[in-house]
Amino acid sequence: TLGLALLMGFLVMLLLETLGLPHAVHHDEDKDLLGLSATIGLIAHAAADGLAVGASVSSSTETGLIVFVAIMLHKGPAAFGLSSFLKHIDIEESKAKMYLILFALSSPLMAIITFFALKDTSFAIDDNIALTLLFSAGTFIYVATVDVLPELHSHEHDNDAPISFVLLGAFLVFLTTLLGHSH
């Protein structure tokens, strides 16, 4: 179940990109599209983080505080990474600031919405919160591996990483989840 939650976050991002999320093609003239694609991916990841915070706070104050601190500890590095990436691909400063503001707002807005939606329900239990965090991690892994890392490591901007390797990795996670493990 844990591996499936991680895999689902990854596959949802793959599906979003396949069905219309701006797809970066890693050419110099497509730097705006690449920046937008990475930003939208990180906004989706941050919204999933906000979902986890809102659900955990509606479940218990202690769990909510732990999840909030854990998520807040990586927001700074995530924002730094996004701003560094946008600078690396030469996105104009005003557009980069707008992307960072949208990224910064996505977690708190989703946390507030989730809190009020779940505060009197039975969904907000620790097991579901853990699954939500793993889903969020899957979205982040997608953005990092499919959009950001290929651009940072490519010297030739006309080569996309083959989708077959991405799908193979997703299948391996699924397979290991099916096989399980013993203690």
Model-inferred region functions:
Residues 1-183:
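Intrinsically disordered, metal-sensing/regulatory segments
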